[in-house]
Amino acid sequence: VRDRKTAAEALASLPDEWKAIDILINNAGLVIGVDKEHEGNLDEWDIVIDTNIKSLLAMTRLVVPGMVARGRGHIINIGSIAGDAAYAGGSVYCATKAAVKALSDGLRIDLVDTPLRVTNIKPGLVETNFSVVRFRGDKDKADNVYKGIRPLTGDDIAETVYFAASVPEYMQIAEMLVMPTYQATGTIVSRN
């Protein structure tokens, strides 16, 4: 989704019966490394920013006009608890997820006179390949992130997406923070 042209071509190649998208889930997101802001790799940050912010903007721009024209639709952006407060070694990632919140809020304002809904789901610790990418393939470091806790799974987040999409059309869940029971904030976690 980082390549706008490819994304547009993929949407154009959908069968006719799938082109009228009712629910857009902007779920692309990653982070590479744990570098300090003044020591980070600018090329890696370009990838993070392109994936976490620009792809969300591109998909929204490509899909939402059709929703507006049809008078129905739901945009669900997957943000992160990291968008609420920065943490050591994650300033750029945290900034991109804060941008997801701002973009979600702004889109909701832009669409206030339509029946479209906008939701920002902000997961806490979810065990996916996210940490493997963050630690540049170091599986041991990635596994340590989840050591001593029961993290959420991708299926758990899918349940929250389903819930947000299933509420009656006269209501919208603007924002949902979802985390494991033993997580209090982005950085405060109780481990066994």
PLM feature spans:
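The beta1-alpha1 cofactor-binding region of Rossmann-like NAD(H)/NADP(H)-dependent oxidoreductases
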Residues: 1-9, 42
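Alpha-helical segment proximal to the catalytic Tyr-Lys
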Residues: 65, 109-112
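C-terminal helical subdomain
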Residues: 120-121, 140-187
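Active-site loop immediately N-terminal to the catalytic Tyr-X3-Lys motif
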Residues: 87-91
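Active-site helix of classical SDR
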Residues: 60, 96
